[in-house]
Structures are given as structure tokens and as C-alpha cells.
């Protein structure tokens, strides 16, 4: 099924540092500008997935190889515009059915640093929803988005997916405990989705938590100005804000600096503060090898392949639907228009009797064709 009109280009934590992934981030205006350019090259839809682990661009186009090359070149251009030193990362590229397999693996958490991470499935669904809302989706991408959701729901029903707290918040907690112990007092800056997950997990594991946010009062949050007052009472500060540029400076903190865990993308901590305090960023969190439950990995991979097989079958059926519809239209035309015309003027033969028999033959023919189509669909 590699003739599927799909291509996917991206980089993850294994291919590119946080700064390179962050340089690819696009607001909706940038997505629309890219989509306008791509339409000129035969692209009918664009889905943009951006997480702390990866940035991926999925497109629908009959010219998969050419469009994938364009997307890869655009990524390199973004890095050149950012003025990064050193060689640029090498994006990965998938076409046709390989794009679907990779996407299902991402949704299942097989491509995440933490095996079975669940949050990425929700992020992927929101990426498809954003594409539909912004009118840069198409029927092929809509169907694929629905199928990725089905794969995830099946994983959850069968218990193969990871626990909810198996994302970057778990990595942050592990880093804090390695540096500050099991009873570390933790401040969390930023109460977006990731910040709230951090608060929930840290509190669940028995840590004393203080919350800080640009908008104080949200979820019991204190204003950012309060961080400096509390620094002496904090062992670690987890920064989970989503600013486009680094903003947390030395002046925001008190005399005694806690360990800082920066899980923002791009980095939220300025270089001067990172030099002054012990700072752990996403790149430092996403290194090394985590213990892998091989049985669980195999279970996830098996479910992904089953989902891919189901998707393949659905595409075959969807492609044959027009054959079935055309067959029905042909039968109706022959049986109720052309056959009566052909039987006009017959002498001694009873036209009604002949017409009934001919309709019966045509009905049998139609059913035989339909069965053949269904058998072909099942065999594929």
C-alpha cells in the first residue's frame, strides 16, 4: 500500500537537539503560509505535530517523494535562518504506508523516550483537529486521524498503553530525586498542560509543591515575583512554561539557587542563569537508555501492526466503494431502461415474462460482481 498519497518528515529527540526542534515551531499563520506554498506542489493537506520529543510534518500528496524533499529542505532552511553553528540534523522521511506505520508507532508511544507514553496520543489528535479547524486537512488525513485514534483506544482497552504519568513529567521527577532526594521541595513554574501534569505527579509521589504562573490564582498559583521569596524553601524548580524565547533570569530568583529542571521547548532558562545554577534541560533528560519491558514493547508493536492491517483493509474497501456504486447504477439502467426498450416489438413472446427473467439474470450478475469485490477486499 505504498501508493498511499502520504509523506511524513520530522526530527525527534534522537535526531535533533531541543533548539533545533524549537526552531521548527510554527503558529497558525506560519502553517497557512507553508500550506499555501505546498498547494502549488500538489499537496492537499498538512498536519503539524509539535511535542517536547518531536516535530513532524505530515502531508497528503500524490507526489510524495518530491514533497518530502521540499519539507526536508524547508527544515534545513529554518535552521539556517536561526543561525545555528555546526552541521544540521538529518530529518527522517516516510512515504505511503510507512508514514502510517510511523504515525501509529508515535501514537502508541513506541517512538517516545518513555515507552508507552500516553500524552503524545492526545497531542497527535489535537494536531489533526487543528488541521481540520484551519481548513488545511483533506479526506485522506481525516480518515488517518480517525484511525490513529482507534489504535490508541484499542491499546487502552487492552491495557497495553503506558500509565498516564509516563511522559516528560516523569523524567523531571526522576531528575529531581536523583539530585535532591525523595523528599525534595519542588516549585513548578507554568500551569499549562505539562505543568499541571507535573504538579499532579509530584504531589501524588508525596512532594511538597509550590505553583507559580504568569496569571496568579490559576490552580492556586502564586505570581512569578514570589519565586525569589521562596527560593530558600525550594530544593528544585521545574520550569514548564511555553514562551518562544528564554525568559527566566537570575533576577527572578533569590540568593540561594535551587536545582532547575527546564522542560520547555525552546529552553526557558537564559544562558546566564544556566551558568549560575545547576540546570537540567530537555536534552539532558532525553539521553541514555531507559529499562525497556520487552514483552510490553512487543505487545505495542503487535497492536500497531494489527491497526495498520485494519487501516489497509479499510482503504481497499474505501477505494472499491465507487465500483460497488457504479455496479448498482449499471444494473438499474440495464434492468429498468435499456431492457424494456430492447423487448419492445416482440411478437408472440410475453414481454413481461422475458423482462422478469432478464432482470433475474442481471440481479444474479450484480450480486456475483459484488461478492467478487468483497472477496477481493478481504483478500487484500
For each predicted feature, which ranges?
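Glycine-rich adenosine-cofactor-binding loop
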Residues: 148, 164-206, 213
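Rossmann-like NAD(P)-binding element
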Residues: 225-249, 259-261, 265-266
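Adenosine-nucleotide cofactor-binding segment
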Residues: 191, 206-230, 241-244
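Short, well-ordered alpha-helix to beta-strand connector turns
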Residues: 183, 206, 234, 257, ...
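A glycine-rich (often HGG/GG-containing) alpha/beta subdomain
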Residues: 1-112
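Internal alpha-helical scaffold of NAD(P)-dependent oxidoreductase catalytic cores
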Residues: 69-87, 129, 133-136, 147-151, ...
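Adenosine-phosphate binding glycine-rich loop
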Residues: 22-28, 39, 254-259, 263-379
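Glycine/serine-rich phosphate-binding loop and adjoining beta1-alpha1 elements at the start
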Residues: 83-181
